[in-house]
Amino acid sequence: MPIVKSKPTSAGRRFVVSVVSPDLHKGEPYAPLVEKKVRSGGRNNQGRITTRHVGGGHKQRYRIIDFKRDKDGIPGRVERLEYDPNRSAHIALVLYADGERRYVIAPKGVQAGDQLLSGTNAPIRAGNTLPLRNIPVGTVVHCIEMKPGKGAQMARSAGAAVQLVAREGQHATLRLRSGEMRKVPADCRATIGEVSNSEHSLRKFGKAGAKRWLGIRPTVRGTAMNPVDHPHGGGEGRNFGKHPVTPWGVPTKGYKTRKNKRTDNMIVRRRNKK
């Protein structure tokens, strides 16, 4: 996909770098697989902000994605690739031999007209989905389940890829991009290849308004606030005179907050430190 740097015809265009995808479908999405999406503005049912920096943005409709890929043995043909405003990856509309259509995360290299297959006997080819116990060690995969039958949870964003490095007993060991080594049940499914649109990270927004189109609001520094609004607020100058904390007083910058001890034994090696 070409990277296009805009000419500085205005202040808002000067620093814009766009990723152009000429292969994407230019019409409407497939209507039976589209749902209404209600924006929360970062508020919960009491109207209180529970997620900061969220609000506004262009109206979006949710595309129902098939993360389970459970149509075993039924070949599907990729009809088209589409843009999805709800995720960084592109999606593919697949027409199966039984007449059903489903959206799936588009793998890198898959084009309109390609055939996709799921099941234990599917060939090892980009876009096909198999249980990890049927995938050769060393294969790069994406859209990986963490519980058999639950649907893909890992490696779903643009350019994501995970390597299957070992298989022992009922578990398979995966190497994530972060450097973390993690075990998952060998019956969990994964899709061969990596996720499409790896150039997604090369986009430069060029102006604040481009972030607002996505529903992302400004991030204000705590030290620029008043004491009533943030532990870093107030005082003379920019020094807040204490260890940095979140707006709720929890230490930040290295303080561990992970609570899920239940799955600690599945992590073989922690992710690389930056």
Swiss-Prot record:
Function: One of the primary rRNA binding proteins. Required for association of the 30S and 50S subunits to form the 70S ribosome, for tRNA binding and peptide bond formation. It has been suggested to have peptidyltransferase activity; this is somewhat controversial. Makes several contacts with the 16S rRNA in the 70S ribosome.
GO CC, any one term: large ribosomal subunit
UniProt entry tagged with the keyword Cell inner membrane: no
Recorded name of the encoding gene: rplB
This protein's name: Large ribosomal subunit protein uL2
Key words, A-Z: Ribonucleoprotein, Ribosomal protein, RNA-binding, rRNA-binding
GO terms, biological process: cytoplasmic translation
The keyword Plastid belongs to this UniProt entry's keyword annotation: no
HAMAP family according to UniProt: Ribosomal_uL2_B
Record Pfam families: Ribosomal_L2 (PF00181), Ribosomal_L2_C (PF03947)
Assembly and binders: Part of the 50S ribosomal subunit. Forms a bridge to the 30S subunit in the 70S ribosome.
Region (Disordered): 221-256
PANTHER family given in the database record: LARGE RIBOSOMAL SUBUNIT PROTEIN UL2M, RIBOSOMAL PROTEIN L2
Molecular function terms, GO-annotated: rRNA binding; structural constituent of ribosome; transferase activity
Family: Belongs to the universal ribosomal protein uL2 family.
